[in-house]
Curated annotation (Swiss-Prot):
CDD domains: AAI_SS. The keyword Nuclease does not apply. It holds the Pfam family Tryp_alpha_amyl. One of its GO terms (molecular function) is nutrient reservoir activity. The lineage of its organism: Eukaryota, Viridiplantae, Streptophyta, Embryophyta, Tracheophyta. This is Alpha-amylase/trypsin inhibitor RA16. Keywords: Allergen, Disulfide bond, Secreted, Seed storage protein, Signal, Storage protein.
Amino acid sequence: MASNKVVISALLVVVVSVLAATTTMADHHQEQVVYTPGQLCQPGIGYPTYPLPRCRAFVKRQCVAPGTVDEQVRRGCCRQLAAIDSSWCRCDALNHMLRIIYRESGAADAGHPMAEVFRGCRRGDIERAAASLPAFCNVDIPNGVGGVCYWLPGTGY
């Protein structure tokens, strides 16, 4: 008889725990938590249309002469990257920034990693510099590995 009471008590504890967890999950989802970027990570919505001007300057200088970047430019870049409200949108903003750099220099949006974007700077080098900015600036990105954005050339991911 005592063992039946223990079993019933244990089952009751499990049921109450499950109900509490379910209520917590329901409350959490009513707050409309966004888990993926979807339509929000677009120029002018999730980040500025002309994003990260300090990061553009930083990446260009890093590409041409690694290690020679002004501390003020580096801090400005990190501030601009951290200011993007949704951490999900940071890699998209960096990818959009790269496309702007390519257009400004007359390079195609997609191309061979060894192709020169501008004098002394290859596409692969500038892409690696941009992709590693979240880790360098110590800002959160939920869609990268070790703080490094990953994307396939020309796709934005």
